[in-house]
Amino acid sequence: MLETMKAAIFDMDGTLLDSMTQWRRMNGAFVREMGIEPTEKQEADMMSMSGTMVVDYFRSEFGVDTDFEALCARACEAMEPVYSGGVPHKPGAAAYLKRLRARGVKCVIATATPARLAMIGLNCANLVSDLDYIFTTDMLNPVSYTHLTLPTT
C-alpha cells in the first residue's frame, strides 16, 4: 500500500502528539474554576467528551452557561504552556512520518487545534520538518479560502 500512497492526512492531538488527556483535563478544570467539584462519574464522562458535547454537558449537568468559543479560548490559553513544554509523540508516530517521507508520501496535518498552538506543539516535538502542509480549523474563513495552509518551513 505504501508504494501507491501519494499522501497521508493525520490529526494532530491524540494521533501524532499524546495531548488528548491534557485537553480533556481542561473540562474538569473549567468547572472547578466555577466552584463546582465534579463526581468521579462526571469526571469520567467529561474525559470522553470534546467540543460542543462538553458545552452541552456543562449546561445540563452543572447549570453552567458558556459557549463553545469561550470554552475554547480558556482551554487554548491553558494548553499553551503544555505545548511549549513539549508534548510527547504517540508511540511510533515520528518514525512512521519519517518512513512515509522517505517514500515520497506527502504528509499533512488537519487539526482543530488553533494554528498558533499547533505550530508550538509540532515545533517542540520536532515534527514540522516531516510535514508538507498543516491545516487548522481557525484558518478557514467563510469569505476567503486563499490562505488555507501554513508553511512548514
Task: List where the protein language model places each region.
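N-terminal helical cap/lid subdomain that shapes the substrate entry/recognition surface
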Residues: 2-103, 116
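Conserved beta-strand segments that form the floor/walls of ligand-binding pockets within enzyme
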Residues: 9-11, 108, 135
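Conserved phosphate-coupling serine/threonine residues in phosphotransfer and NTP-handling enzymes
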Residues: 15, 111-113, 149
